[in-house]
Amino acid sequence: MVICLSSFPAYACTGITLRTEGGNTVAARTIEWAGSDLESRYVVVPRGYTQRSYVPGGKKDGMLFTSRYGYIGLSVERAEYVVDGMNEKGLSAGLFYFPDCGSYERYDALERDSSVSDLQLVPWILGQCSTVDEVMSAVGRVHVVSADERGSTVHWRFTDNSGRQVVLEIVGGRKMWHENALGVLTNSPDFGWHLKNLNNYANLYPGRASGLEIGGMHLKPFGGGGGLYGIPGDMTPPSRFVRAAFFLSAAPCLSSSEETVMQAFHILNNFDLPIGVQTNMDVAVPDIPSATQWTVACDIGNRRIYYRTMYDSTIRCFDLKATDFVKVKYASHPLDAVKRQPVRFVKVQTD
């Protein structure tokens, strides 16, 4: 199955990036899909593993590629469709939906040996590149085509061990790169538009709003956080981008990577979309517990990937440094062995 967004336009992704006092980078994000269970899996890919890309029409007839580096990623629908992950060199990559704004070049069967599908660009890059510079060079040598021309386009973010992050958008068949010092990414419109839109909120600031004397009255805010009164609270990509940018700007820089990872999960709690709010009133609500199907955080310096899911909010971790990508075999497993939230009972002491 290919995710065809034209048939169910209820999707969203929010990405943030934090840094520790020592300069380590944590790239985190949510993935939302309110249409059905994405049947997500974690995929372990060793060095030397060979894959072939899908091309429009559903055939595995595109570029053949072999991994130079091992990586672990999270996939949707098919194990080949890794949408976020990190490799052993500390390169993180992820795709975000980009509907109605992007447009790839048309697929040419004569160029199939250098054509990679949009939904397989992440695994190809993770297996080939160690730095953002290498990513930009590699992408320039291939044709990125749609896995399913009925579906949405996507855009991508890439973060390397130095902390540098770039966003790739393909518009009119042209590859456009954006440096992302802000560290935020959502969906449409284009990345440049989101940056300009932040100017509409230059009056906002973290903390308590100041009081005001008016007509002999002393006005004061009802509670803390009044400096952000008016920040957009809906679930559209522009509003999520603004909220994420301001939440990041107010977040303290922490000393340890693990604390920073937990901070990323706390920030992304604000983008956990309940099921039903993205579904039209005349459409049946899918039988899943949340539109936010999983949240992942890549601790780049320590080569650790943390995740939780809509079924189990327990945070789990892969340690890439402890993984031998020469000896390990290719593997693909569901993110949740059991699709049910575990509950730990606390025994009340009676004496």
Enumerate the language-model features and the residues they cover.
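Short hydrophobic/aromatic-rich beta-strand segments that constitute the beta-sheet cores
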Residues: 27, 93-95, 177, 305-308
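A cross-kingdom feature marking charged/low-complexity
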Residues: 169-187
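Short, surface-exposed beta-strand-loop junctions and turns on beta-sheet-rich folds
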Residues: 33-35, 99-101, 173-176, 312-315
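Catalytic cofactor-binding cores of redox enzymes
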Residues: 141-175
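A contiguous strand-loop segment
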Residues: 12-113, 150, 334
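Proteins synthesized as precursors that undergo proteolytic processing into mature forms
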Residues: 111-145, 149-150, 257-266
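C-terminus-biased signal that marks the final domain/tail of proteins
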Residues: 11-26, 34, 39-40, 147, ...
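N-terminal signal peptide c-region/cleavage motif recognized by signal peptidases
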Residues: 7-9
